[in-house]
Amino acid sequence: MSTTSLQHFSHSYSPFPSSRSSNRMAQSQTSGLDTLAEGSQYALEQLQMSREAAGDGEATNSMGKPKDQYQIDNDNHHNNHSLPSFKNSSQRDPLVEARSTIRKNSASAPVRRRISRACDQCNQLRTKCDGQNPCAHCIEFGLTCEYARERKKRGKASKKDLAAAAAAATNPGQPNGSSGKEDAAMVGGHTSPDRRPTLNGRYDPAFEVPRNLNGSAQHSEASGMVGMQNSQHLPPHSQSSMGGGLEGLSLNGYNGLNDSSRPSMPVPELQSLHMLHNSHTNPRSPSSVLPHHRYNGGYNDSAYSLMNPQEPNSTSISHFRLGSSTENPPNSFLGLSPPAQSPGWLPLPSPSPANFPSFSMASFSTTLRYPVLHPVLPHIASIIPQSLACDLLDVYFTSSSSSHLSPQSPYVVGYIFRKQSFLHPTKPRVCTPGLLASMLWVAAQTSDAPFLTSPPSARGRVCQKLLELTIGLLRPLIHGPAPGETSPNYAANMVINGVALGGFGVSMDQLGAQSSATGAVDDVATYVHLATVISASEYKAASMRWWTAAWSLARELKLGRELPPNTPHSRPDAERDGDPDADLSKRHPPPLITSMGHGPGNTVINITEEEREERRRLWWLLYATDRHLALCYNRPLTLLDKECEGLLQPMNDDLWQAGDFATYRQAGPPVECTGHSMFGYFLPLMTILGEIVDLQQARNHPRFGLAFRNSAECEAQVLEIARQLDVYAQSLKEFETRYTSSLALGAAETEAAMEGSHLNHVSPSGRSSSTVESRVNESIVHTKMVVAYGTHIMHVLHILLAGKWDPINLLDDNDLWISSESFVAAMGHAVGAAEAASEILEYDPDLSFMPFFFGIYLLQGSFLLLLTADKLQGDASPSVVRACETIVRAHEACVVTLNTEYQRTFRKVMRSALAQVRGRLPEDFGEQQQRRREVLALYRWTGDGSGLAL
């Protein structure tokens, strides 16, 4: 096939009209709605008429030579032999003549200015787009402007299109002969170098790049397109379908694919890269089970059908051009749609340029700032940019204090993992995609990135997609629907290998010998992330499903037990743990810890001290939240003290992040304050709270509660818990003295003070005396804030020990408890808690230090003040009035930091009571009291009450 013939045929059939023939093509084209409404038969009629109109003027090729008459007749034969009425112009249908006349008469009509397609970003954000490339909106916000998403058609594919695809897949291509010219013309992604592609009639500046390919290069490239079939061997319906595909072909999708100056990559390379990608991802992620698809070269019913891996009959092409953009490098992402058996509750979006797997290839991708994200990149590419994912990982590990680690995000209640292990530039920790997706989801809740704040609905949409992705990657316990309500995909989503676990949607490889130790720990941490955010929302009752799954899996993995020592033949822990930056990928062997009861025998794998500490911290975090939620939702404990009496207590957070693994620590649940993190000051309080919860459950037992309340055993338990609270109070004083007086006295010895107290973990630079003094002062303030929070919760636990948790029972006072000595002691603790809250507001005005935990203790510490204000009204003491004012201020700060319904409700109740204390009685005083009672009745801590879980 000559180059001249190829160029001429490309001129006649290329979907990108040249500047010379663009006007004529615009005249012959109908509107986009007409093209979508008509079938391939109608599109073929348009093609025939445009060719006949161009027959007289275009009978010569670009070199001025007349076109071969045989070629013209042959073209007419190949394209029209299924339609006898179009063999020559004299036999045309009158309807076609009428349509042709209408098109010719409408040539002078004004061109429509309405754009036919918005860019991918504007489409996703539902923002008005000007149709340019790049568009004004993407330029303004620095977004990647692409037109690469699939153009969808209404309804299912026609039988003709499916038959054409089947024929294209079965017939081999012809490398030479006259059919090669037609093959070249049918390649929608190939354009002649002297033509300017247009975008729906508008010139696209993205295509204005130098093209230096000579004729021979174009010829070899066109002949290398294996998937384009010889039209002589296609059945008539296939010809009609492909002819119609030319007329209705969407050109938008080729902005980033059909640039002849961009590098090409053979499909074998892409397939090898795809396998490389699968080898680096978690074997349990959905993408790893997707088959290797061949890339479709036929048009079918979509301009993107060649990128649709789910097409049942597809042909392969030997070369593919990759588009590039300014923000997302040309790496990138080639057409993997969501699996066909995606769960019904996981509505993954249709393929956008970012729904495709990322290929780790130096020439096609920039350096990823945090390589730990590699397993999740293929899944999040359609949701957030790669740079934003790295920023969100930074947000997750951001500390609000430079002196001691304190998570800035309200949804990160405690650090389970080392920051350096995740953010290491070359040897990061190996993580499951589900854990990484959940971390990004948690960070996206509060990140101030422009991508999440403009428009205002962007954060909700991104967080929803990340949540669905996290659940899909986690494959959690799925409760089966009722009989007759099973969705079509339900059976496909249930990967069941055993009878015992099959009913809950859990396969044996998740908990058995096929799962990795760290993978199982990552799953528990993912459950924690999901449960924490949902607990802080208005769906508190729903969060218990996730907490229960986390507690159950932690118990099955025996996280509450210390692992046996490593085998002697392995490298000692001291040698491996001495280098915190060692190859972390080697710290996570694939087999599960069989010594915990999974798998044959009692062989013990080697596990590093970092992995052991991750297990401990995860257990203690679940242990603390179990007791905290038992108070919040009026429920019994799930994790028992007996299960973890031999488990070492978590180490100091600053030492943990620095990689300085301590060898000596106490075991069992702690009762003394030891540090600035939630494991240091909050975990001991939760140990004591667990005993109070057990005591309260025994008091409220429907059959044995009355006898227990009047027994000596109950009184002995109360005294023991009170003693433990006194021990904690003493440890709190010693903690304050140790971290305030010693730092203040040692401030002059700047270098020694900084080295001795491990306060330079944030930045090793800046060792001037002013910097050291500033950090010492910040450490002192941080210590005082921890002491204030610990003091407040300790006073609340004293109030809870009295057994009056329910606000309605307090207001009714049926047992006259308000006149007892126990009430007087509890009231003193209520005033003490309010004073501690005043100190908290001084050091932490927005209550951002521990917003997830603090709300319930602020609420329970306020019920007695509400009771006093309701009973005494204007006769209340000044200390009670000040305490009520402090509680109102604290609730207002809580509403700003972590807005929840019960805090908004109780703030209104306390404001109403405070107005009564100050003597401002409204006219409808009785109605307000009744309304206040109705509001408080929503939150009950009686025998069958559910607390905050509405």
From Swiss-Prot:
DNA-binding region per UniProt: 119-145
One GO term (biological process): positive regulation of DNA-templated transcription
Function as written in the Swiss-Prot or TrEMBL entry: Transcriptional activator of the xylanolytic system. Involved in the regulation of extracellular cellulolytic and xylanolytic genes and in the regulation of the intracellular activities of D-xylose catabolic genes in the pentose catabolic pathway (PCP) in response to the presence of D-xylose.
Biased composition (Low complexity): 8-22
Regions of compositional bias (Polar residues) in chain numbering: 23-33, 81-92, 302-329
Name of the protein this chain belongs to: Xylanolytic transcriptional activator xlnR
Keywords for the protein's UniProt record, in alphabetical order: Activator, DNA-binding, Metal-binding, Nucleus, Transcription, Transcription regulation, Zinc
Record-stated family: Belongs to the xlnR/xlr1 family.
Residue stretches of biased makeup (Basic and acidic residues): 65-78, 570-586
Species lineage: Eukaryota, Fungi, Dikarya, Ascomycota, Pezizomycotina
Main localization (coarse): nucleus
Domain of life where this protein originates: Eukaryota
SUPFAM superfamilies reported for this sequence: Zn2/Cys6 DNA-binding domain
Gene3D superfamilies: Zn(2)-C6 fungal-type DNA-binding domain (4.10.240.10)
Gene expressing this chain: xlnR
InterPro entries linked to this entry: Transcription_factor_dom_fun, XlnR/Xlr1, Zn2-C6_fun-type_DNA-bd_sf, Zn2Cys6_DnaBD
CDD domains attached to this UniProt entry: fungal_TF_MHR, GAL4
Ranges in a coiled coil: none
A matching Pfam family: Zn_clus
Subcellular location: Nucleus
Region Disordered: start-end pairs: 1-97, 163-247, 300-329, 561-603
Record-level GO cellular component terms: nucleus
GO molecular function per UniProt: DNA binding; DNA-binding transcription factor activity, RNA polymerase II-specific; zinc ion binding
